[in-house]
Amino acid sequence: MAKNYFDITLALAGVCQSARLVQQLAHQSQCDEPPLRVSLQSLLDLNPPSVRAVYGDNPANLRMGLETLQNVLNASSREGLGAELTWYTLGLIVLERKLNGNRGAQAELSRRIDALDRQLSHFDLLSDTLISAMASIYVDIISPLGPRIQVTGAPVVLQNTQIQAKVRAVLLAGIRSAVLWQQVGGGRFQLMFARNRLFKKAKQILSHT
């Protein structure tokens, strides 16, 4: 059965969007709000009718992620900001595999996200309350699976507890996209042997956004 590279590329762009948001937060103490909202919202729909639906039914919502994916696929340097994006992306993919092999963690994650959905009727998605709840899910369920993702940035920024919470919430959203990527046929071999195909598909999707 032929793989759907549109869905695979879109879900992987979701992972990369989280990577870029983490990088922005770690270095600048802030990030672009529209893609942040899209990424965090993706956490709350665990039974979507399509991959597009996870991201607001509009690939343009993943423009940041698609551009970051192209950068990751093109990255030749192992240093600097490009390397950070690659490590964050790969780190999220590795953690998803750990989650996939742990039924207990999956069940607890589903339960906690259901509770998040209920809170959304009382708080805005980007409120400190919901961001903190998402961060707690990451700390309680994802972090213990290991290996931990080492976030690099400005030390004074990374010591800020609100930034720490946002980073963890965004990493949780990245895990959600990594789960989706696997569900639609994504795999690590594509990052080695289908890089050109993924790059072209990302470019094609971007040209229509």
From Swiss-Prot:
The keyword NAD does not apply. Transmembrane segments: none annotated. Keywords: Cell inner membrane, Cell membrane, Cytoplasm, Membrane. GO terms for cellular component: cytoplasm; plasma membrane. It is found in: Cytoplasm; Cell inner membrane. It comes from the Bacteria. The keyword Metal-binding does not apply. HAMAP family: HflD_protein (MF_00695). This is High frequency lysogenization protein HflD homolog. The lineage of its organism: Bacteria, Pseudomonadati, Pseudomonadota, Gammaproteobacteria, Enterobacterales.
